[in-house]
């Protein structure tokens, strides 16, 4: 496993821990995966939210907590530079769920 992939996995793991601890209990925020730019200056954390109607609120919450999340990652990950974090809804997972629903209903 290359360095970039290890860092992405660790960011995913720590983000999931942080969001489950800090999140409200009205929705479930799942960290689907994380990606880092080749220069390791930016990372995007992809999340899914249940129930779906809480998605916008959960995304806003996660984006507000980016600074705290970055500090948590910095404290728990042994690398010199922590990438700037962005958070987005995992559209691939969302599309997969729509396809599954369409297949069930046909």
Language model segments and positions:
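Charge-rich, low-complexity N-terminal segments
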Residues: 1-106
